C-alpha cells in the first residue's frame, strides 16, 4: 500500500491503475478506523481491482461547537489496518491540499430535501460539508464505485442523491452496519464514552429493534411508536435528539402503506452524540 498526500500524486496513480485496466473503488473516511471501516475496504476488494481509501478530517462538516480539534488523528495505526484489509492506496491530504483557497470562499455543494431534518436539523451545514468534500474526492479519484456504511444512513441518502442529480458515473454501495457483540454500532466516537455510558449505549439499538418488531407485527401508529421510543431512551439514560420513522429511499416521513421503512435515532450520552438506524421491510 502506498500513501499519497497531494491531488497531483493521486491523479497520477489513478491514471496508472486505469491504464492497466483496473476497476477502482473509493472508501472515504475521516480516520480513527475501526472494524466497520475495514469491512468496507474488504467489500471494495471484492468489487474492484484497485482500492483507494481516503483519510481526511473535513473541517467543512464540523459546526463551531463540535469536536473538530478533539477528533482522533491516528494515521500510523490506520495505515496498518488498511494494509491488513487489502487497501492499495491511501490518500491522506491536509486541509490546505483539499481547500487551497481556504474554506471561506470554497464552492459548496448543497443537496436539498434529503439533507433536511434528522441530523441536518441538529447540525446545520453538516451535509453541505459532506457533499462538498465527497464531490471533491469523487472528482479527484474518479472511482468506478464508492462504499459507505449504512450507519450514517442520511449521509448515504445525501450521497446517492448527489450522484444521481449530478449524473456522476459512480456506483454507490451502502454496506450493513458493523456492530459490537452487544449490538452497539461501531463508531469512532464510541471512544468518548466512559465505562458507565458504554454499558448503557447498546440500549439505543435495542429500542430501535423493539420499534421494528412492532412495525412488522402490523403497528402503523408511527407517531405513537416514536413517542414511546423517545421515552424509552430517556428512561435508559439518553438525552434524545430525534427518533423518527421514514420511508427508506426518499427519507420522507413514513405513511401507512409504505413497504420499506427506516427507523432513525440520534441521542446523547453525556457529551457524546450517538446515531443508529434500523431498516424494516414489510412483507
UniProtKB/Swiss-Prot annotation:
User: Where is it located?
Assistant: Cytoplasm
- Read off the InterPro entries from this record: Cyt_trans-like (IPR004821), Pantoate_ligase (IPR003721), Pantoate_ligase_C (IPR042176), Rossmann-like_a/b/a_fold (IPR014729)
Q: Which residues form the active site?
A: 37
| Keywords per UniProt | ATP-binding, Cytoplasm, Ligase, Nucleotide-binding, Pantothenate biosynthesis
| Chain sites annotated for binding ATP | 30-37, 149-152, 178, 186-189
Could you state one GO cellular component term attached to this entry?
cytosol
Any one of the GO BP annotations:
pantothenate biosynthetic process
Look at the named UniProt entry and state the broad enzyme category this protein falls under: ligase
Pathway field: Cofactor biosynthesis; (R)-pantothenate biosynthesis; (R)-pantothenate from (R)-pantoate and beta-alanine: step 1/1
Source domain of life: Bacteria
Role: Catalyzes the condensation of pantoate with beta-alanine in an ATP-dependent reaction via a pantoyl-adenylate intermediate.
Give the miscellaneous note.
Answer: The reaction proceeds by a bi uni uni bi ping pong mechanism.
The protein's assembly and partners: Homodimer.
Q: Which family does it belong to?
A: Belongs to the pantothenate synthetase family.
What name appears for this protein in its UniProt entry? Pantothenate synthetase
Species for this entry: Azotobacter vinelandii (strain DJ / ATCC BAA-1303)
Lineage per the UniProt record? Bacteria, Pseudomonadati, Pseudomonadota, Gammaproteobacteria, Pseudomonadales
Amino acid at each position: 500500500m502506498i500513501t499519497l498526500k497531494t491531488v497531483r500524486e493521486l491523479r497520477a496513480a489513478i491514471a496508472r491503475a486505469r491504464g492497466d485496466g483496473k476497476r477502482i473503488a473509493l472508501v472515504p473516511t475521516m480516520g480513527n478506523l475501526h472494524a466497520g471501516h475495514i469491512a468496507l475496504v474488504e467489500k471494495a476488494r471484492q468489487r474492484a481491482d484497485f482500492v483507494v481509501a481516503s483519510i481526511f478530517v473535513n473541517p467543512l462538516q464540523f459546526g463551531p461547537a463540535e469536536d473538530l480539534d478533539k477528533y482522533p488523528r491516528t494515521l500510523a495505526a490506520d495505515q496498518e489496518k488498511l494494509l491488513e484489509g487489502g487497501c492499495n492506496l491511501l490518500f491522506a491530504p491536509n486541509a490546505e491540499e483539499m481547500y487551497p483557497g481556504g474554506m471561506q470562499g470554497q464552492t459548496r455543494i448543497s443537496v436539498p430535501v434529503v439533507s433536511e431534518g434528522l441530523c441536518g436539523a441538529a447540525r446545520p451545514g453538516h451535509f453541505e460539508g459532506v457533499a462538498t468534500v465527497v464531490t471533491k474526492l469523487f472528482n479527484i479519484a474518479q472511482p468506478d464505485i464508492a462504499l459507505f456504511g449504512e450507519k450514517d444512513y442520511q449521509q448515504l441518502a445525501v450521497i446517492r442523491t448527489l450522484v444521481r442529480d449530478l449524473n456522476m458515473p459512480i456506483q454507490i454501495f451502502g454496506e450493513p452496519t458493523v456492530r459490537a457483540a452487544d449490538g452497539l454500532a461501531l463508531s469512532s466516537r464510541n471512544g468518548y464514552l466512559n465505562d458507565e455510558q458504554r454499558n448503557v449505549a447498546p440500549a439505543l439499538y435495542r429500542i430501535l429493534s423493539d420499534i421494528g418488531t412492532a412495525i412488522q407485527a402490523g403497528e402503523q401508529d408511527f407517531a405513537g411508536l416514536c413517542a414511546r421510543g423517545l421515552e424509552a431512551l430517556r428512561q435508559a439514560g439518553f438525552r434524545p435528539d430525534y427518533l423518527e420513522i421514514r420511508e427508506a429511499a426518499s427519507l420522507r416521513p413514513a405513511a401507512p402503506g409504505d413497504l420499506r421503512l427506516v427507523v432513525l435515532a440520534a441521542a446523547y450520552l453525556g457529551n457524546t452524540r450517538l446515531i443508529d438506524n434500523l431498516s424494516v421491510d414489510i412483507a
